[in-house]
Design a protein with these regions (language model features):
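Inter-motif core of Ras-like GTPase G domains
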Residues: 15-40, 52-60
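Generic enzyme active-site microenvironment
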Residues: 1, 35, 67
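Walker B catalytic acidic pair
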Residues: 4, 38, 70
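A conditional alpha-helix N-cap/helix-loop micro-motif detector
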Residues: 12-15, 47
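Glycine-/small-residue-rich active-site loops that bind phosphorylated ligands and cofactors
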Residues: 7, 39-42
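C-terminal-of-GTPase-core extension/linker across diverse P-loop GTPases
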Residues: 41-155
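Switch I (G2) and immediately adjacent beta-strands of P-loop GTPase domains
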Residues: 1-10, 31
Length: 155
């Protein structure tokens, strides 16, 4: 388990290499958790920057779960019912956003509120199941295991 630095916008060019070196562990990871502040107005741009950075360091092919945090702080501007102008991203509800991202990512994302502990159990279950996929204990097929099993069941 490793935690990297949070999103840094407009990082000075002199620090880019040292910033990327802190992400070296990403290349060794089995699973990435990309936590996004969904209440930030530029969260989609931040996702793109992180994805580009992951590709730049060779981690773009890693399995990734996108975790949208701060759903309790998400806001939108409600349109009047008779307003026929097209919706902008400021008018999209959280439910509409969930459907959009779920469709884009084949449900490899989760919407949570760490502060309010909303959907935390779902996050734990998702992580448990995903980690279990990567770390299944396997035993070689041989008579030795059957002998141990027989000894245990005959007692």
């Amino acid at each position: 388990l490793s935690d990297t630095v949070g999103f840094i916008r407009k990082l000075p060019t002199g620090l880019v290499d040292s910033f990327k070196s802190t992400l070296d562990e990403v290349r060794e990871a089995d699973l990435l958790l990309h936590v996004v502040d969904i209440s930030h107005p530029g969260f989609e741009e931040q996702i793109e920057v992180v994805n580009k950075t992951l590709n730049d360091i060779g981690g773009g092919d890693k399995p990734c779960i996108l975790i949208f945090n701060k759903i309790d702080a998400f806001t939108y501007v409600q349109k009047e019912e008779d307003d026929l102008t097209p919706k902008t991203k400021e008018n999209i509800t959280l439910e509409e956003l969930k459907n959009t991202w779920m469709a884009k990512l084949n449900e490899n994302c989760l919407f949570i509120s760490a502060r309010e502990k909303e959907n935390i159990d779902e996050l734990k279950e998702l992580l448990y199941n995903r980690v279990k996929e990567y770390h299944v204990q396997r035993f070689p097929y041989n008579d030795f295991l059957f002998q141990i099993y027989d000894e245990d069941t005959n007692e």
